Amino acid sequence: MLDIQLIRHNLAQTKQKLALRSKGLETLLDHIFELDFKKRSLQSEIEKYRALRNKQSKEIGLKKIKGENVEGQFSELKKMGSRIEEMEKELIQFENQINTLLLSLPNIPHDSVPTGGPEANKVVKTWGEPRQANFPLKTHWELGRELGILDLERGAKLSGSGFSLFTGNGAKLQRALIQFMLTIHTEEHGYKELWPPYLVTEDCMRGTGHLPKFALDMYATDKDNLYLIPTGEVPLTNFHRDEILAESSLPLRYVAYTPCFRREAGSAGKDTRGLLRLHQFDKVELVQITKPENSYTALEEMVSHAENILRSLNLCYRVVLLASQDMGFGAAKCYDLEVWSPGIQSWLEVSSVSNMENFQSRRMNLRYKSSSGKNILCHTLNGSGTALPRLVAAILENYQKEDGRVLIPEKIRTYFKEEYL
């Protein structure tokens, strides 16, 4: 959530910066500005009435001591109290309106972010070479079916389209990759592992910016008003919601494996074949909570942590700096990591690493106490380290052999215990 001070004191500049993300926000910003002006005017009026009431209350007290008649003044005092109550209710309405509108605004892009849509995305790094083969390469769904490790038909029978079902060595590969990634992130990168709930409250979803903006993309339980998490970012970032952290404890680094659940309401026209776009998928998520001055160093660090996973698996990948209109709702700056999948001849996003600055912490009331005793909003960052379905797809397509077998990447054989699928 944006700071109301930006709109109150720098409206023109805020309009200019948010226009880089989306057109049509000027009217909304003007409306927030007007509501805030009315709210502050009402606050001033309430304060004047309170001061007058206090003054008259003291006068009545002195007159009563002297035995003077205060019936008329007491009646006026009661009317004034009723008027203050009415104005306070009106003030709450203004505050609720403003907060609701602020929740609908995206984050302001960092100055280093390219301007524009997906066409303005910038490839900042490429590692490895796309695989070349002297035989026709199969797609991951063909390999999965032929090896008997991926049953999309039965997944659909159980839950409908958009759900996968791994069997035998396919399930074993998933488990090996999860264990491998968690080991790397905890032992080499210094993250603390959490095993969080997969159902969270509305406050948690609002805290990370998934509500109210993406309500239609979420799976919700109506009776309990709980939401299935769309990403491990939600429980990990909300872990310290409504807390004041010690400055010495920062940065905090958390990692967790979780399944993720997304309705993908806006996926029409996108490639949904095989493992490319699912309603339920597995992911290892990274979150850091930092001081503001350290968050952009942490962002580059988190990108390198996700890269380490891909390099360890010897997968060709590229790092893409997303443009202002292609970033996630709450991101100030975001990198995507994409692996080359030769069977489908496409780059697949397996990680998205974002600096949210204080966009989430303002929503979550997440602060730290500085050495001067001041409570300061933390910066939060999140990233996939990495997502499983497309990583599995890339491994199957990159490591396939002409005889139909798939070589297991060397780094995960310790967990898989076999050389081939």
Curated annotation (Swiss-Prot):
Pfam families: Seryl_tRNA_N, tRNA-synt_2b. ATP binds at residues 262-264, 349-352. It catalyses: tRNA(Ser) + L-serine + ATP = L-seryl-tRNA(Ser) + AMP + diphosphate + H(+); tRNA(Sec) + L-serine + ATP = L-seryl-tRNA(Sec) + AMP + diphosphate + H(+). The keyword Repeat does not apply. One of its GO terms (cellular component) is cytoplasm. It comes from the Bacteria. GO terms for biological process: selenocysteine biosynthetic process; seryl-tRNA aminoacylation. Gene3D superfamilies: Bira Bifunctional Protein, Domain 2, Serine-tRNA synthetase, tRNA binding domain. It is found in: Cytoplasm. InterPro entries: aa-tRNA-synt_IIb, aa-tRNA-synth_II, aa-tRNA-synth_II/BPL/LPL, Ser-tRNA-ligase_type_1, Ser-tRNA-synth_1_N, SerRS_1_N_sf, SerRS_core, tRNA-bd_arm. PROSITE patterns: AA_TRNA_LIGASE_II. L-serine binds at residues 231-233, 285, 384. Consists of two distinct domains, a catalytic core and a N-terminal extension that is involved in tRNA binding. Belongs to the class-II aminoacyl-tRNA synthetase family. Type-1 seryl-tRNA synthetase subfamily. Homodimer. The tRNA molecule binds across the dimer. Catalyzes the attachment of serine to tRNA(Ser). Is also able to aminoacylate tRNA(Sec) with serine, to form the misacylated tRNA L-seryl-tRNA(Sec), which will be further converted into selenocysteinyl-tRNA(Sec). This is Serine--tRNA ligase. It comes from Methylacidiphilum infernorum (isolate V4) (Methylokorus infernorum (strain V4)).
